[in-house]
């Protein structure tokens, strides 16, 4: 991992730290000089499981990890865990589209109010840097989960515009993170093991593909390069759901597919960057950085200084990015640790 000197003798807090992202962060930070990593989450069983895994696999890292039971919905528990923290990776979220669609206020309480609690505490505690994790579903959102994440992003940008003291707050936006908790590839593999056909919502539906290591790399890149309110997006290839199902069967065995129709709140394709955001985007090689819209309540300078364009030609979507064929999709899914373990029949060892 590059740029690890910035973490020397520092304290990093990960909200939602027992999830797929938090576990991958720990793997990446195993050989850094962090003084302490704080795992903040609400599930004591997952914390206990993580504690035991760390003690077995990396006793030295385990000695640096502290666990805090709490919920981002509870502002006081967030503040109690944040004393002395230098950096925060904010990953706590409700992210399942159907459950958020049926219980939208639960998504609001975690994704919107919870983020507001984290950012207010970070500013008050003088945290140096906060990287928040968002989703492609926040761009042109049509479902409750995406709308709650779009509101989360608005809170980030508002704090950046209004002044957050010494705290730099930025955001990353992800496509589909392969083999993260609740994602489709582990479901496909499980159904193949059981001899059941793969359930496909719409074979022409497209989704961005990235692995968990790339997700952590994106956060690291944002951490190193962010100005207040910046949004970072990784350039990512995409696959159709039909080709993804075909690729998984090529690797693990054929069981056929069953088209079941789209779920509540699903899109045919996802957008990582809107037309409007592309106007402010800087191409940084493997990533885009979208600068925060710095307008305050006085828009006069935009009238006086000249005309401002309102749209780029098109959004950056899973339909117009690099499209993987079945062979390319096979190569991509094999970069996921879960798939590598599953090829040896050891997927039960994967942490999700």
Where are these regions (language model features)?
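Strand-loop microenvironment adjacent to phosphate/nucleotide-handling motifs in alpha/beta enzyme folds
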Residues: 2-6, 154, 158-352
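Hydrophobic/aromatic anchor residues within beta-strands of the central parallel beta-sheet
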Residues: 67, 107, 169-172
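Conserved Rossmann-fold NAD(P)-dependent oxidoreductase catalytic core, especially the SDR/UDP-sugar
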Residues: 90, 94-150, 154
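Conserved Rossmann-fold cofactor-binding substructure of NAD(P)-dependent oxidoreductases
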Residues: 65-87
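Conserved glycine-rich Rossmann-like NAD(P)H-binding loop of the short-chain dehydrogenase/reductase
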Residues: 33-49
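Rossmann-fold scaffold of SDR-type NAD(P)-dependent oxidoreductases
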Residues: 15, 82-91, 132
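Conserved residues in the N-terminal Rossmann fold of short-chain dehydrogenase/reductase
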Residues: 41, 68-69, 109, 202, ...
């Amino acid at each position: 991992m590059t740029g690890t000197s910035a973490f020397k003798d520092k304290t990093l807090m990960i909200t939602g730290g027992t999830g797929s992202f938090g576990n991958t962060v720990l793997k990446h930070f195993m050989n850094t000089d962090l003084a302490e990593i704080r795992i903040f989450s609400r599930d004591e069983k997952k914390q206990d499981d993580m504690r035991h895994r760390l003690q077995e696999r990396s006793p030295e890292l385990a000695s640096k990890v502290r666990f805090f039971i709490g919920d981002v919905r509870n502002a006081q528990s967030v503040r109690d865990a944040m004393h002395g923290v230098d950096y925060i990776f904010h990953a706590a979220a409700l992210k399942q589209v159907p459950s958020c669609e049926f219980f939208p206020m639960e998504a609001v309480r975690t994704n919107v109010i919870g983020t507001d609690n984290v950012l207010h505490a970070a500013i008050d505690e003088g945290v140096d840097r906060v990287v928040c994790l968002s989703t492609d579903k926040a761009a042109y959102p049509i479902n409750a989960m995406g709308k709650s994440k779009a509101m989360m992003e608005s809170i980030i940008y508002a704090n950046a515009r209004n002044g957050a003291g010494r705290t730099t707050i930025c955001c990353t936006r992800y496509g589909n993170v392969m083999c993260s908790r609740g994602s489709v590839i582990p479901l496909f593999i499980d159904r193949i093991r059981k001899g059941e056909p793969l359930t496909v919502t719409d074979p022409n539906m497209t989704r961005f593909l990235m692995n968990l290591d790339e997700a952590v790399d994106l956060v690291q890149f944002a951490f190193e390069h962010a100005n207040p309110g910046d949004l970072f997006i990784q350039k990512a290839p995409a696959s159709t759901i039909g080709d993804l199902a075909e690729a998984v069967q090529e690797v693990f065995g054929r069981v056929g597919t069953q088209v079941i129709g789209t779920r509540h709140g699903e899109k045919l394709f996802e957008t990582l960057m809107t037309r409007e955001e592309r106007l402010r985007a800087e191409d940084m090689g493997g990533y885009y950085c979208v600068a925060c819209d710095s307008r305050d309540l006085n828009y006069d300078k935009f009238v006086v200084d000249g005309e401002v364009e309102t749209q780029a030609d098109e959004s950056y979507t899973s339909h117009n990015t690099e499209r993987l064929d079945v062979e390319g999709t096979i190569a991509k899914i094999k970069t996921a640790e879960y798939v590598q373990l599953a090829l040896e029949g050891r997927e039960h060892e994967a942490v999700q």
